[in-house]
C-alpha cells in the first residue's frame, strides 16, 4: 500500500477515519483561526483594501471566498464575514463564502452554524473539484 492510500484511509475512511469519526467539540489541535478573530480580521482588511483598489465597474458582481478544510467551526470564514459585514458593506453585499471539507458531517456542522449567522451567504461542498 502506498503512503498516499494509507493516509487517505487513516484520515477519511468512513468507519475509521480521523476526520469522519471524530466530531466532538474538543479538538486534538488548534489552528490560528481558533485562537481568535485576528487572522480573519486581518484578511478581511486586506480584502477590503483590494476591493477599493478596483474601479467600481471592475468590482465583480459575485466575489467568492473559499475556505478549504473549514472543519466544523469555519472560524476563519466567520471572522472574515463578521469583519466585512461591519466594515465593508459593499464588498460584503457581493460576497459569497464557500466552505470545503471532505468530512461531510463537519461541513454540515459548519454550514449550519454560519448559515444561521449569515443567511444566503454561505455555501459548501465536500470536493474542491466541484467549485
What are these language model-derived features?
Residues 1-130:
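Rossmann-like AdoMet
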Amino acid at each position: 500500500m502506498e503512503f498516499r492510500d494509507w493516509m487517505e484511509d487513516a484520515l477519511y475512511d468512513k468507519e475509521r477515519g480521523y476526520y469522519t469519526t471524530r466530531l466532538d467539540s474538543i479538538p486534538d489541535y488548534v489552528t490560528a483561526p481558533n485562537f481568535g478573530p485576528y487572522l480573519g480580521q486581518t484578511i478581511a482588511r486586506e480584502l477590503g483594501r483590494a476591493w477599493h483598489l478596483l474601479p467600481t465597474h471592475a468590482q465583480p458582481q459575485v466575489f467568492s471566498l473559499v475556505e478549504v478544510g473549514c472543519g466544523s467551526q469555519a472560524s476563519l470564514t466567520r471572522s472574515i464575514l463578521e469583519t466585512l459585514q461591519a466594515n465593508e458593506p459593499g464588498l460584503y453585499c457581493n460576497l459569497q463564502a464557500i466552505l470545503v471539507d471532505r468530512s461531510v458531517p463537519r461541513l454540515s456542522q459548519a454550514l449550519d452554524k454560519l448559515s444561521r449567522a449569515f443567511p444566503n451567504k454561505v455555501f459548501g461542498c465536500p470536493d474542491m473539484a466541484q467549485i
